[in-house]
Amino acid sequence: MNFFNAEHYRAVKKFVCKLDGARILDIGFGNGVTIKKLSKNINAKFYGVDISADMVEKAKRENRDGVNTNKVILQQGKAEELPYNDDFFDTVYTVNTIYFWEDTAKVLDEVRRVLKDGGNFICTFYTKGYLDKLPYCDSGFDKFTPQQVRSMARERGFHDVKVKILSDCKAYCLVGTKIEGE
C-alpha cells in the first residue's frame, strides 16, 4: 500500500473491521501491506489472489507472521478464475485493480460465486476523469465512471449497491451485497 491507497485502505477497513471470525478475500493484493494491516487488527482469516508471481512472493514476505500461523493465505491466480469454492467468503474486496481486469463482467460473476449469501463486495477505484489527467494512465487501464461501476455491479446481480465518494470526486468505494433468490 502506498500513500495514494491510504484512503482506499480506510474505506475497506471500515467495512471489514467487525467481521470477527470471517473469511475475507483481497483480489490483487500487490505488496500485501493492506492485508498485513487488516489482519493485525481483525480476527479473521485473510486470503489473497494476485496475478503477479513476484507480488505473491513479496506479499508472503511482508505477511510472514500471518502466513506462518495460517491466518493469511496468498496465491497466484487471475481475478477472472478465482481458485476458491462457491459461497466461501464473507467479504471480498479489491483496491485499485478494476482497471486491469481482462473481463470485468467475469470478475464480478466470480466474486458473486465465491461470496456467501449476504456477503459484501467492496471495490475502491479512481474515476475515469481523474485517471485521464495522469500521464502514466494513457494505456493499459480500463477507466470507469462511478455510474458505470455501479451499473456493472447491478447487472451482475449485486444488491443494495452503493458508491461513496472517498476524496474530491476522484476516488470512490462501491459496496454491493450478494443476495440469493432475488
Question: Language-model segments: which ranges?
Answer:
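Conserved alpha-helix/loop element of class I SAM-dependent methyltransferases that forms part
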Residues: 3-21
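Class I SAM-dependent methyltransferase SAM/SAH-binding core
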Residues: 25-81
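A short acidic, Gly/Pro-enriched loop at the edge of an enzyme's catalytic core
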Residues: 80-91
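A short SAM/SAH-binding and catalytic strip from SAM-dependent methyltransferases
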Residues: 91-103
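A short glycine-rich, Lys/Arg-flanked "PGG" loop and its adjoining helix->strand segment in the class I
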Residues: 105-117
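Conserved beta-strand signature within the Rossmann-like core of class I S-adenosyl-L-methionine
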Residues: 119-125
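Short alpha-helix
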Residues: 141-156
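Core SAM-dependent methyltransferase catalytic element
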Residues: 165-182
